[in-house]
Amino acid sequence: MAEQDINEQVIERLKEGAGHIINMFKSVFNTPIGMDGRRALTFTAAIAGYACHQAVKAEHGTFAVVTTNDGRNFYFGDDLNKYLLENNMNVVGFFTAVSGIGHETVLQIVKDCALAVGKDQHTVCGFNPNILYKEISECWDGIFENMTSRFCEKPSEWPVLFGIVAQNILIMSIDGGAPKDEASMVAIESAVYMSKMDCDSVLKNG
């Protein structure tokens, strides 16, 4: 069977699984006046970035580690960028496919995130990155057995699954009135920043 056919079959399977996760997040972020689009977008894009990091770990890939003055570690490198930026089905590509944001803008966001990691008072789209990381990691653990591992056959599919989820939330946010480019940049920043974090990236009192 051709590789393209295999990829199409995988994507269709992951889209079906993503639908269940999307419905869960729509319920989680529902408010009396509708879905909290910005929070839902930040969270789902962040978990897509987190999925990139977890896929590298699960496949025993290599990180380039940057240690801050206060002893926290942040993670970079080619193996991470493969899922985040480079594969045919990379996470950031799910967002640029919606908005048409160009390569130079994406590159600037990536650079800005690299410069911002670990800095005091830095927020990820208005959210404390330490708190966001804790929420993301708890969610990941909570749905991994019943959803992620059920819908995905191997770790390399995790970023694709959650990229599809976040792309759909992005589209919903735009349909709800969010400016297309601004919403897309929120998604990109959230995914890129969270992909750099692990448990040793978090301030102990953060």
Q: What function would you assign to each model-found segment?
A:
Residues 2-206:
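Solvent-exposed interaction surfaces and binding hotspots enriched for charged
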